[in-house]
Amino acid sequence: MKKPVVEFSRPLQIDRVPALGSRDRLAAEDKECAALAARLGLFKVHSLSAFLTSMPWRGGGLRITGNLQAEFDQVSVVSLEIFRSSIECDVERYFLPPHKSGQDSEIDSDIIQDGVVDLGEVVSETLVLELDPYPRRPGEVFQDIHEDVEPVKISHFTGLLKLKRDLGGGKN
């Protein structure tokens, strides 16, 4: 089976992570930013970086913590104008070997594939979860076009009243 193409790949061999953990600084290059923008539906990714700590966890697993920073352009769903946004958020993910996956229902963990965890993909996935699916420029408010128009109140008896008036039986 062919592995999917990952736009921002930083593979980490879990057996090379020291007992006291490792620290990594990741930064996407321009080409990776362009590929991520296409994948995430953003107009442009200016920068994406993260500081991560990887620690051995639960006998063969890995705990990844840290934070990410991203700066990007996106299109407002209200005005369709491009505007710049930034995100800074925490990263916290857990990985277990396939034979231990699903044994602990308290913590949501991913499966370690072939002894490797892709730190770049961890960062990309965290960014995706932080993006607003309906982005708007700061201060921009969606307004219904017909907001000022009074709704027409129609009664079920309007037709009968009109018929009564037409037949001359009703008051004006």
Regions found by a protein language model. Name each.
Residues 1-21, 94-172:
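Charge-rich, low-complexity linker and terminal segments
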Residues 26, 50-52, 66-68, 87-93, ...:
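A structural signal for short, well-ordered beta-strand segments
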Residues 61-102:
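Helix-adjacent hinge/juxtasegments
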